[in-house]
């Protein structure tokens, strides 16, 4: 016998449906297939922002820090960035991103790398959409939205300058829900 919280069970069922059917994302002209425990792009505001914000002039290389499902890397590749290095430290996220990159036919443009935050080198564009709740996750599904002690956010902000080319841009895409809830 085992006991599973209803919230956890509903999360597993939702993740299964998203993975089976995919989430339509117009900015990539296709669908993203999220895995359980990897953030699903069910709200499109941040995706639309990446799809429409002006890219740095001549941007042929970008870093996507904490790629998760690979959605930001895919949007950048669809926009014409020739090489996107997408990083994550989580094997589940990298497997999810790989599946999505392959299904979207973007393997030539996107390199996936397991590392904690930044790859080596510098890029004219470095993008990060970190988890937005500064708390400790208690289940696998929460890793997609919980950033203990804002570790990822602080690491991105602290390391960004060392990974930008001169006149490069860092894009931090983050929800303000933690501020509204008094968590940050």
What are these regions (language model features)?
Residues 140-165:
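Glycine-rich S-adenosyl-L-methionine
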